[in-house]
Amino acid sequence: HRTYLPLVGFALVVASIFSWVYLTCLKLSQKKVLGFSMHLGIILFLILFSLIAIDRNKVWKDEFTLWTDAKHKSPGLIRPYNNLGQAYDKIGNYDQAIIEFQQALSINPNYFFGLNNLGNIYGKQRKYEEAINYFRKALIQKPDYSPAHYNIARAYHLIGKRQDAVMAYRKAIQYNPYFEQAFYNLAYLSMELSNFDESIENFNKFIKMQPNHSKAHFGLGNAMMMKGKLDLAMLEYRISGKLDPKFALPYMNMANIQMQIKNIPAAIKNYQKALKIKPDMASIHLSLGMIFYQFKNDIPRALSYLKNALRLRPSQPGADRIKSLIVELENKKPT
């Protein structure tokens, strides 16, 4: 593809040479046979190269044809095997991707791109220990390779080694200060570990790069809420809900905060907004049922929400207590 623009100049030069030769020959001889021969030669030349171009375009049909052709023509080069492996990875053909990456590594066992890519495939197959092994090998070859630190962090997280994951995410960020997903993942992981200050710091750094990311604002709101900064949490939840009108959780969490501060009318509104977006959230039906029972003494509405909560999640914790409350309220309901 990179030769297309330079070929314009090459084509002009070749065409000029043909024109010069053609005109020179006509000047030297006025014979019609020569002119006919020149025309015929040019036509045959164009037909030949057109056929070659058509055949060559088949190679450029897609990534598979291109890199398969490249590896057959240059079997000693690593890049065609690696790129063909990535193409198989994209379509989910992981077994074939492994074969291609292993062939690349047979040429150069220290090829860190191939080691990292092979680790990714094993990670997608949930073979996390094998994945970690290849990420480590990649990092031995290139200790500052940020994607391998990120990938090994994800693998550590998935097998429960959360502190190791934190350290690896920090390394990924150290070598690439603009690694957005590393900031995002580290922020959520830090919150899991109750490191709320680090979580807030990383969410803020991520949001500087992705200010319109609804779930990042939601995560920052959660971290603020866990720190007891309820006003800041409410602010982030509002931003999150505004950025993604189909995201119900910010409204649910705003309602939870409003319940803490006894702002019952506002809590009801936000719970109902959440249900409008996602009507099958059993926990919100339960919360509204309890609100209308305990704070509004509205038995019909309380019953409606409680029954929906039980219908949507029959085996939820406390299901027996909900059933008992429904029976109790049914007996209290005016006839």
Model-derived segments and their meaning:
Residues 1-136, 144-151, 178-181, 185, ...:
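Polytopic membrane enzymes that build or remodel cell-surface glycoconjugates and lipids
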Residues 293-335:
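Terminal, low-structured helical/coil segments at or just beyond the last alpha-helical repeat
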Residues 79-90, 112-124, 147-158, 181-192, ...:
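Conserved alpha-helical positions within TPR/SEL1-like repeat arrays
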